């Protein structure tokens, strides 16, 4: 919906998305949390206590945080889709479901002692996965989200995300305000390159992975544009653009990103806290540039901004 031009396709797929959420809703308990979900509930290839064939821990009450967080994110996204097609009744339905589940997750899994979300109600095991999704779902915001994000990077007791799930980890770290460190998070991809791979392995175990070509590990392909160059959609069908560069130690960088109406071209030169940004948007597309807490307006065509 946010990036593509075929909005009719999005509308056609909404009924199917509703049915999928209805399936998971059948396993919700009175407090909204999921219990007894059948099948192989794969989350990530994690080789830590309590994980089994990619499936996260289930607590003594039969529930676990990852399935609950995925359902919460599904409700939140479904509300956006319903609002987009003008169905405010259904949007409110999903908002209400999300609000109940969000409160239940907070009560069941938040560890005040650890300052993190636990895998189960026992609050003994923790993961980058759960805390990434918690940030993305808005359970923690502002300074508290930043604190959780920093712990995900430093607390070695957390089960780590594999190369595939780092997509969500990095998205959460950026949302929490740590995006300027993005280039410091790419060690596993550098290991792949050092091994001579030209595609990405299935798991973070580069020496032992069964597959040397798994597209699910290719998140830098989008994050170089969305995080580093900071180009992102700000409206359905990419009708508006928000550009918020996170350059880290880089002084100069540029790139071109495909857009339904052409392409977005950027070139940045950073000098201390100052940024010179040459930005070209497709005709008829407007947007904003965000730098150092200030917002600058962008119009279709060429824009040159001296930001500080």
Protein language model regions, located:
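Non-catalytic C-terminal accessory modules of carbohydrate-active enzymes
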Residues: 96, 103, 180-308
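Well-ordered alpha-helical scaffold segments within catalytic/enzyme domains
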Residues: 1-9, 70-88, 132-142, 168-177, ...
């Amino acid at each position: 919906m946010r990036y593509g031009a075929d909005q009719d396709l999005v509308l056609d797929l909404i009924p199917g998305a509703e049915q999928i959420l209805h399936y998971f809703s059948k396993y919700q308990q009175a407090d909204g949390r999921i219990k007894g979900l059948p099948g192989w509930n794969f989350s990530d290839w994690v080789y830590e206590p309590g994980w089994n064939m990619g499936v996260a821990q289930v607590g003594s009450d039969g529930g676990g945080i990852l399935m609950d967080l995925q359902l919460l994110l599904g409700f939140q996204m479904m509300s956006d889709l319903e609002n987009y097609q003008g169905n405010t009744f259904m949007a409110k339905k999903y908002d209400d479901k999300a609000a109940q589940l969000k409160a239940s997750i907070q009560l069941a899994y938040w560890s005040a002692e650890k300052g993190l979300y636990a895998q189960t109600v026992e609050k003994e095991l923790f993961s980058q996965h759960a805390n990434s999704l918690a940030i993305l779902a808005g359970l923690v915001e502002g300074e508290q989200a930043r604190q959780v994000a920093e712990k995900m990077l430093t607390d070695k007791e957390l089960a780590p995300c594999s190369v595939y799930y780092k997509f969500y980890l990095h998205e959460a770290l950026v949302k929490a305000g740590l995006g300027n460190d993005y280039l410091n998070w790419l060690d596993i991809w550098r290991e792949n390159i050092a091994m001579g791979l030209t595609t990405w392995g299935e798991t973070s175990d580069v020496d032992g992975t069964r597959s040397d070509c798994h597209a699910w590990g290719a998140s830098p392909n989008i994050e170089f544009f969305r995080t580093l160059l900071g180009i992102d959609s700000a409206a359905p069908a990419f009708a508006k653009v928000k550009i918020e560069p996170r350059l880290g130690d880089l002084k100069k960088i540029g790139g071109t990103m495909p857009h339904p109406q052409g392409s977005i071209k950027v070139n940045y030169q950073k000098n201390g806290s100052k940024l010179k940004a040459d930005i070209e948007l497709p005709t008829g597309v407007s947007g904003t540039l965000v730098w150092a807490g200030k917002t600058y307006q962008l119009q279709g065509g060429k824009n040159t901004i001296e930001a500080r």
